[in-house]
Amino acid sequence: MSKCSRKKYIKTNLRQMTMDTMESQQDGSVTDSVAENESAHMQNQTGQNSIPTLTQVSVAGSGTGRGSPAVTLVQLPSGQTVHVQGIIQTPQPSVIQSPQIQTVQVATIAETDESAESEGVIDSHKRREILSRRPSYRKILNELSSDVPGVPKIEEEKSEEEGTPPNIATMAVPTSIYQTSTGQYIAIAQGGTIQISNPGSDGVQGLQALTMTNSGAPPPGATIVQYAAQSADGTQQFFVPGSQVVVQDEETELAPSHMAAATGDMPTYQIRAPTTALPQGVVMAASPGSLHSPQQLAEEATRKRELRLMKNREAARECRRKKKEYVKCLENRVAVLENQNKTLIEELKALKDLYCHKAE
């Protein structure tokens, strides 16, 4: 289809639209200046619009009363502007001037699927990066345990393929491994053997066996731990589960005020001077954790409850006593008022009798 035939086809369609519009209008009289201004305004708008596939058709019915043709502005897809005059004139002008402009906009916007696919790829890539940067709970706990002293370190699980370290002798597998605040490692085996390592040793290497025996001299339930290792400051820190522990040092005697720092869920033991006849170099370690056992916590709660109930009973007793005193005071007041009332009644009778005798 050639360019000329396209223009003719568009003009024919526009004339048909103009005829239909003019027939549907009742009162469409406007001045020529208004039509020209509207046409110029539509030209500016069509010049600013950058959509190539946009076609605007403006139909303005204009007439000053007689012989004023309708002006139609057409913008072609190539950017050309065509003015088309209507053939049908307005039959009768109206006093009311109501300009009516009909704008038909046809826009075609093609959206490709490539943008959506690229956004989905970017979102999945960002999600994978966030998940890869997110630290694990074990890593966070290891960092916390390395920064804060006295918190047990969480050892990574070793594979079964790794062999036994050469510095560790053949011994029973320990059930619990703990680390003190000075860097020593303490392992408690199933048979009751305690193994302690020096602060300079690597991991659990260099563990030294400690003999733990029971003795009849200390109080029942206590445990004697004998060890020959000695640290730089002459003290040892270890953990033994139980309520009371007796520690014996073969080389140096522990200070009575020495505190064995505990980590994890193990109780804290405070070394104190023995109260019984124990061998020289043996001191008693009492666990303050036993003071906060569930049984004692329950007893403490029961004691507080009983104390509160006792205070409530005392307050109620005092309230009842004051109420009784108040009632008794009111009863005494009523009795006094009754006596006064009787006295006044007797005086009134006496005065009446006296008045009657005088009247006679």
From Swiss-Prot:
Positions of region (Leucine-zipper): 330-351
Gene3D superfamilies, A to Z: 1.20.5.170
Region: Basic motif, residue numbers: 303-328
Residue numbers of Phosphoserine PTMs: 118, 145, 287, 290, 293
Ranges of residues in domain bZIP: 302-360
GO cellular component labels: ATF4-CREB1 transcription factor complex
SMART domains noted in UniProt: BRLZ
Coiled coil region boundaries: none
Keyword set, alphabetical order: Activator, DNA-binding, Nucleus, Phosphoprotein, Repressor, Transcription, Transcription regulation
Mod. after translation: Stimulated by phosphorylation. Phosphorylated on Ser-118 by TSSK4 in vitro.
Alphabetical GO biological process terms: regulation of transcription by RNA polymerase II
Pfam families, A to Z: bZIP_1, pKID
Chief location of this protein within or outside the cell: nucleus
Chain positions covered by the region annotation Disordered: 20-52
Domain of life, source organism: Eukaryota
Start and end residues of each KID domain: 104-163
GO molecular function: DNA-binding transcription factor activity, RNA polymerase II-specific; DNA-binding transcription repressor activity, RNA polymerase II-specific; RNA polymerase II cis-regulatory region sequence-specific DNA binding
Subcellular location: Nucleus
Function: Transcriptional regulator that binds the cAMP response element (CRE), a sequence present in many viral and cellular promoters. Isoforms are either transcriptional activators or repressors. Isoform Tau is a transcriptional activator. Plays a role in spermatogenesis and is involved in spermatid maturation.
Similarity comment: Belongs to the bZIP family.
Oligomer and partners: Binds DNA as a dimer. Interacts with FHL5. Interacts with CDC34. May interact with TSSK4.
PANTHER family (UniProt xref): CAMP-RESPONSIVE ELEMENT MODULATOR, CYCLIC AMP RESPONSE ELEMENT-BINDING PROTEIN B
Official protein name in the record: cAMP-responsive element modulator
